[in-house]
Amino acid sequence: MKITKAEVEHVALLARLELTEQEAETFTGQMDAILAYVDKLNELDTDGIVPTAHAVPMENAFRADEVTPSIGIENALGNAPKRAESFFRVPKVIE
């Protein structure tokens, strides 16, 4: 697949990138080389190959949920500069 300078400039416009003429020329060559390499993959015989999402089996790496006591309101608010009952009091940020 051959990519043109106009296509590179169009993608740059969509990405809101300003490219110099030199950058557009450079990226056109680089993108063309990348797409040519990827196009080689189309030559591979993949019949009988099962599609996979991961190269290795994935397992859930999360720990089990455990109920533990919290630090409590007094400890949490102990060093708060201002508080209102059981809440942190912060300056108003919306006018």
From Swiss-Prot:
Q: Which InterPro entries match?
A: Asp/Glu-ADT_sf_sub_c, GatC
* Catalyzed chemical reaction(s): L-glutamyl-tRNA(Gln) + L-glutamine + ATP + H2O = L-glutaminyl-tRNA(Gln) + L-glutamate + ADP + phosphate + H(+); L-aspartyl-tRNA(Asn) + L-glutamine + ATP + H2O = L-asparaginyl-tRNA(Asn) + L-glutamate + ADP + phosphate + 2 H(+)
Pfam families, alphabetized: GatC
Tell me which Gene3D superfamilies the record gives.
Glu-tRNAGln amidotransferase C subunit, N-terminal domain
Tree of life domain:
Bacteria
Give this protein's Gene Ontology molecular function annotations. Answer: asparaginyl-tRNA synthase (glutamine-hydrolyzing) activity; ATP binding; glutaminyl-tRNA synthase (glutamine-hydrolyzing) activity
Q: What is its EC number?
A: 6.3.5.-
**Could you state one GO biological process linked to this protein?**
glutaminyl-tRNAGln biosynthesis via transamidation
Q: Which SUPFAM superfamilies match?
A: Glu-tRNAGln amidotransferase C subunit
What are the record keywords, sorted? ATP-binding, Ligase, Nucleotide-binding, Protein biosynthesis
Complex formation: Heterotrimer of A, B and C subunits.
Q: Which family does it belong to?
A: Belongs to the GatC family.
What is this protein for, i.e. what is its function?
Allows the formation of correctly charged Asn-tRNA(Asn) or Gln-tRNA(Gln) through the transamidation of misacylated Asp-tRNA(Asn) or Glu-tRNA(Gln) in organisms which lack either or both of asparaginyl-tRNA or glutaminyl-tRNA synthetases. The reaction takes place in the presence of glutamine and ATP through an activated phospho-Asp-tRNA(Asn) or phospho-Glu-tRNA(Gln).
Q: What is this protein called?
A: Aspartyl/glutamyl-tRNA(Asn/Gln) amidotransferase subunit C
**Record gene name:** gatC
